[in-house]
Amino acid sequence: MAILTAEQVEYTYQTKYQTVYALRGVDCAFESGQMTAIVGTSGSGKTTLLSLLAGLDVPTKGSIRFRGQSTAELDRDGWRLENVSVIYQNFKLFAHLTALENAAYPLYLQKRPKKEAEAEAAAQLAAVGIQPDQFGRCPRMLSGGEQQRVAIARALAAGSELILADEPTGNLDDENSRNIFTILQELAHERQRCVVVVTHDMELAQQTDRVVRIKDGRIAEEE
């Protein structure tokens, strides 16, 4: 059963001369235990759709629904904190925090005791291959692949049901890209998370459970 749905979603924005349709009539559903890739050319609307799914913006028309309820009717900040983790291409780690503190950050926001939060963060860092002697390092002391693993550990520590990733392997070499994709697959299949990934890498996209192709703001194909 779908945990997250887009129903007749339209998203527009205004330029000086015209109304631009970034998305038109988008219908799609996403399930727990499944990894979905959203693909399309630059400007096709795939990142806009991911932002709407994450509750970072609201559709101009139509609705995004989580367990049947429109996200527009929810306290979106509270809903995101409890249910959504977004993994970005540029990692979005805090430069002044250690790997452990970055991974624990969503638990700090949830008011979890510091010791408990950092114990959970340490467990998730270990799960994605970050070694204990790296826990105290700031992001600048980690490689790109290691920083992305910290970002994924942060998503794991948060306990989010929805893991949404925007080009998570875009800055990584082939080996690290495959490793990160494997971790995301394990999140979906072994931890029963709903994982949605925007990617331009068709080879990696074909390894997901489902591929949604967007063209000119519309869903052109699903496979």
Where are these regions (language model features)?
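ABC ATPase NBD coupling module
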Residues: 71-85
